């Protein structure tokens, strides 16, 4: 299972929580997407899926996979009232330490937000749907988002959400697999040399 985080956006560059807001790639993000295609090479996949958000779809296309099928379960974590804010800004407003991983999000004006468990359930649903492809010995390629893919990896590994410890840069390629029947991380946060 190969995972690609979308290329840089203005909000990812400035550390803003970018959940369901549809932010386009920057020029650097487009370059990162093309470089992800270099890392992927000419490898063949039994299924190619993407978040329906434009930053992931454009990354898929620029990485050489315009055929990627949008899957709504691949959207980023819904940050609710914290959408568009930075972690330092949230901490300053709250007046105490805060982590999206342990403290969660608040209801927003236009969206209720989402718990980490809700994101885990979405990730588990995707893993369940692609299992038949993997069982046939074919690879699956997924284009999505940083927090989502970190949670996805923790679900794959059957670990509690320790995803905050798995840094994932923009345009990075990662791979999950099995060793002796045990789910493992094969590669993490791989980018093409500049």
List each model region and its residues.
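Generic beta-sheet signal
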Residues: 1, 138-146
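Short glycine/proline- and acidic residue-enriched helix-loop micro-motifs
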Residues: 96-118
